[in-house]
Amino acid sequence: MSIEVVDESSFAQGRGVDTVEVSHLARYVLDEMRVHPLAELSVLMVDVEAMARLHVQWMDEPGPTDVMSFPMDQLRPGREGRTSEPGLLGDVVVCPQVAAEQAKASGHATADEVLLLVAHGILHLLGYDHAEPDEEREMFTLQRRLVLGFLARIGRPGDPTPTVGHRALPAGD
């Protein structure tokens, strides 16, 4: 599985984005979702200005957003006993500065918010969406389960509540 994580942001609160941890989370999510071992994923961290440009260009919405996903081969999750087809999963672009604002509003660490956003972006690449309330509940519950599973696996405490667009899903869901 090819996972490339690049931090082009100037986010420097503390040590910046832990690209190794992000890479490990991405691998965990792809494994849990039974994505083919030969699939390729790119994760890019960008500044507010770059994210704002992408947001206008692709969504025709002003200002930066937290995460954007750019699917390539329309891969879907695998099933029990079967992985997805191999191919290019696509790109996930995260803005750590927006993540920091959302983390503060939600009461958890920026690093946890970045992990949530990367998981969220990967789920979008796999065909998940949150346009309807039922889709949102399914996607946010899955994203939270994946991040909590990853944090448990690496032995790091945390209980981040998913946020997207500055809206939080209650932690009990």
From Swiss-Prot:
**Major subcellular location class:** cytoplasm
Q: Does the keyword Membrane apply?
A: no
* Alphabetized UniProt keyword annotations: Cytoplasm, Endonuclease, Hydrolase, Metal-binding, Nuclease, Ribosome biogenesis, rRNA processing, Zinc
Q: How is the cofactor bound?
A: Binds 1 zinc ion.
GO cellular component: a single term: cytoplasm
PROSITE patterns documented for this protein? UPF0054
The protein's enzyme class: hydrolase
Q: What is its EC number?
A: 3.1.-.-
Gene Ontology BP, a term: rRNA processing
According to the UniProt entry, its GO molecular function terms are: metalloendopeptidase activity; RNA endonuclease activity; zinc ion binding
Cross-referenced Gene3D superfamilies: Metalloproteases ('zincins'), catalytic domain (3.40.390.30)
Q: Which cofactor does it need?
A: Zn(2+)
A Pfam family cross-referenced in the UniProt record is YbeY
In UniProt terms, what function does this protein have?
Answer: Single strand-specific metallo-endoribonuclease involved in late-stage 70S ribosome quality control and in maturation of the 3' terminus of the 16S rRNA.
Family that this chain belongs to: Belongs to the endoribonuclease YbeY family.
Kindly provide the name given to this protein in its UniProt entry. Endoribonuclease YbeY
Origin species, per record, is Kineococcus radiotolerans (strain ATCC BAA-149 / DSM 14245 / SRS30216)
Classification lineage: Bacteria, Bacillati, Actinomycetota, Actinomycetes, Kineosporiales
Q: Which gene codes for it?
A: ybeY
